Each structure stands twice: as C-alpha cells, then as structure tokens.
Amino acid sequence: MADYQLIVIGAGPGGYEAALRAAKLGKKVAVVERREAGGTCLNRGCIPTKTLLHASAIYRDAKNGAHCGIHTEDIHADMAEIFAYKRAVSQKLSAGIETLFKTAKIDLLRGTALITGSGCVRVADADGSANDYTCDDILIATGSVPSRPPIPGLELAMTSDELLEGCDHLYRSIVIIGGGVIGIEFATFYADLGCAVTVIEGMDRLLPNMDKELGQNLALILKKQGVKVFTNAMVQRVEQAGEDLAVHFTCKETEETVSGEAVLCAIGRRAYCDGLFADGVGVEMNGRSIAVNANFETSLPHVYAIGDVSSKIQLAHVATAQGIACVERLCGVQDHTDLSVVPSCIYCRPEIAVVGLTEAEAKEMGIPVKVGKHVMFGNAKTVIADPGRCFMKLVAHAETHELVGAQLMCEHASDMIGGVAQALANHLTAEQFCRAMRPHPSFEEAMTAALEDLCERLG
C-alpha cells in the first residue's frame, strides 16, 4: 500500500491549494517543500511586492498631501523597517498555510524532492539524509525562478529574488531592465520613495504583451513621476563604474549609457524543474517547461504538472485554478472554473487590470469587434484620488454582442476585473452586463459609462 494517495511537490499557490482541495475530497496527501510554505508568490513575489507598494503608497500620499490639507514634516522612509514589515506579512501568511495543512491532516515534508519513478519520490533533508515515499499520483508545482539572459556583466544586476531580500538604505538610483509587470511594480515602489528610476524595455512600448494604449499611458504617467523610460532599447552590457553600475544599451541605433547605484534584471521568469528527476527518469519537455495535456498529465504515468513549471501564463491564480482542477479530475469531481478566462493585474498607480482579448488580438483572430471606452476625467473618485489619466475599455463581438475582453487603467482596477472575468466566463452580452446598477460615488460606475458607449456602438 502506498504511503500517500497524492504527493504534491511545491507549496506555492498552485501546490498548497491543490493539496487542500485533494484532502477535502478524501485523499491522503503530503506536500514536499524545501523553503517556506507559500512558495515564490507569498515569499519572493506577489505578496512581498504588494507589501512594499502599500508602504511606499503611504509615504507618497503623506508627502504629497498638502493639496488636500495634510501637512507633514521630516517624513522619511526607513528601508530596514519597510523590509521587516514585508517579512512579517509573509511569515504570518506562511504560518497560516502550515496551520491549514495541520487542520486538513496534510503532511508537510521538509526537503528537496527527487522523482525516482512513477509514484516514487525521494525527499532529501538539508543535512543530506533522505527518505523514500510511494504514492498513487504526483503533482509537480515547483513554479519558476527569475531569468538572467547571457548579457555581459548582467551578473552584477539583482534579480527580484535578491532585491526582495532587502537593503538597509534607499538606493540613490536604480536601473530596471525590463518594462513588464515585475519591472513596472518595482519602478513604482522606488519612484514613490524618491529614488531616481530608469526603465529600459526592449520592445516598442512598456507592457508589450498588453493593449497598446495601456503601455503608452503608463509611460506618460511614469515620466510625470520622474521615471526615465527607454523603449526599443537593447542592453549590451553592464559594468562597474565607481560606486555605481553602468548599463550600456542601444536605442534607435545609438549607444546610450545610464548609471545607477543598483540594477534590477526583470526580463522574465523560467520554469523551475532543475534536479527534479532522477537519472533515467524524465518527462517530455516543451522548451524549458514541462509538457502536459489538457488534463495536466505529463508523459510519465500518474505524474501531473501545473502552474509556472508547465503553463504559458505564469500567474499565481492560474496555478491555483489549475491545481484545483487537476485534483478534482483525479477525484472524479466535475471542475467548474473556466481556465481560458484569465485576469491579470499590475499594481502600479493607477492600477492596470485586463482580461480576455484586446481589440488588436481579436482582429488578428478574425473576430469582428466593437470597443466601448470611458476616460475617467469626470469620475468623482478619480478626481479625488488624482492618480493620472484613467480609463476603461470593453471589447465585444460585433455580431453576438458577447463581451470578449476588457482593459482597465484606474484606481482599484484589480478589485474590479474579477467581475468582468465573471461576465466573460458566463458569456454575457454587453447589454446584460450593463443591467446592473453600480454605486455612486465609485470607480466602478465608470464601467457603466464604458458599457453604454459600447452598447451604442454595437447598435
């Protein structure tokens, strides 16, 4: 008889949620984790960055409160205390996951996992001792790690993992290589605190994988906040330059140099499955990711993979949804989440949140669409908060009127995109989504204005 019915490798948002769901469905479950419960998201990613952004927003608003009668003197940011706050939040949430495991009678096996065969996992402790476990099924949820491309001198730059370890002082200046989600959130954090920030992006705009207007609008807002932005810029090398680091890059066929006390490499992440399989044991790969079918099965029988290690979309909530769907299918339970509808958020100011197709993507796919838009100059809550130019765009099929996408750039966009995702998952038309009364004053009432514009265009 096997030791467990399911062994989950990795206690991140995909792994721990899958384990909890499997235990609730009656499985005997173990989770292998060599670091803190919660994985990258909780300890080196989503939650730490949001904690830092919460702290920097308090500083920014206090420092800039004179326009509404709030006057402060001698305000300063203590970086050691900010990072201590970040650690305390992560530790509290990590401890909460371990408590959930105990309540659900899930065994947390501390150590590094090695898959020695179908249904066989060896767990090595830090001291080198190892124990072998058998199981009916294995779920790989090992996540991803920061990428560092082969650019000369890039080893001098930090990754997000290293930056989040903390620093006891505020950098005078920082150069961020990469204008995607990770780079933009760190740019926001350091700009809020008064650090001189430069962002270098290789594509023609920030957030190149999103709607064009989002990246263009973000660049304008960041520049107003004092951030230098270079696009169509390819980094050639990084060098030590006295106390600073010099980043050399080409922009419009001209070589440029910008220096900073620190450099962050935020070019992306890669699937992490290093050393996961014993010699002679392996699975089919899709590039550097583990290949899976629609049911998350790998080429090795009874071995499954979810989240960043196998998914094209590297988001914590995607890993969670995939993990839950995987174990529900294993247990013969009908899964209910539409995995094709994926909201995505960027926690800059104003926030950005998207779901579904952009107008350009729909047209490339041959889908006839109409777009409704509302610029929030007259939205009362936006005028009060004054985060910069905000807008909402909604995309619908021109013939069926079914909503197919949305792009929000406004305060609390991350808290509103879930409602739009619900509309997409349930195939609501623009007219159906417009029926709901939205509260006033609120940021969300701009959704009604965007929907009314969309309905007029649909006819």
Question: Predicted regions span which residues?
Answer:
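Gly/Ala-rich phosphate-binding loop of Rossmann-like dinucleotide-binding domains
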Residues: 19, 23, 187, 191-192
